[in-house]
Amino acid sequence: MGPMVERVQVMRGTHRGIGPLFGPLPGVRLGEVIAYEFELPARFEPWPGRTRLERTFVLLDVGVSFANPCWVRTRNPDGSILQMDPKGRDSWYVDLLTVDVQGDRYTFRDLYIDVIIPTDGRHHRMLDLDEYADALADGTMSLQEGIDGLRRWQRFLDRYIHNDRWPQAGWSDFPPASVRRLFELPALLTDPVRWEG
């Protein structure tokens, strides 16, 4: 029968409490995976056939989150337009996180390093390693946090992206098989929380 899905609350934010946390967001946990959803504001235009409801998954074993962004373009508050690559519809955006657990409440904070993982055969694209280095250099992140983050990131890459020494034609386990049941669930929220960022 397998593990049962349990309801949890999720808070999300930037590293070290810079800015307010967003939440609580209703979510679910199945084994070592959490899924939660929130609605993007109207300035985000969804891909055809999709809504502004964004589902994010968190792999607790390595402390990373990932989502298949539901939007194709957005108008930023300064009036500029950010447009996704048309090939990006089925790509995944992955973030390294810190994870804090208090009962059934999970707080996830961004830990700078990101990777975009396409599912159409293109290579992945690493981002924000410079921000990670800056946080270590200026003391925003402790040395111990930095070491832990890099070790978990390498475990993620080895376990889910390339588990052989030499890269294969596809990803080892991405999107991970462990998220399949949560991916297939209908909408998790009856009244989604809207992000106003």
Regions found by a protein language model. Give the residues of each.
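Charge-rich, low-complexity N-terminal segments
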Residues: 1-56
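Intrinsically disordered terminal and processing segments
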Residues: 34, 39, 44-48, 52-59, ...
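Short, well-ordered loop/turn elements at secondary-structure boundaries
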Residues: 30, 87-88, 118-120
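A hydrophobic, small-residue-rich beta->alpha segment in the mid-to-C-terminal subdomain
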Residues: 111-159
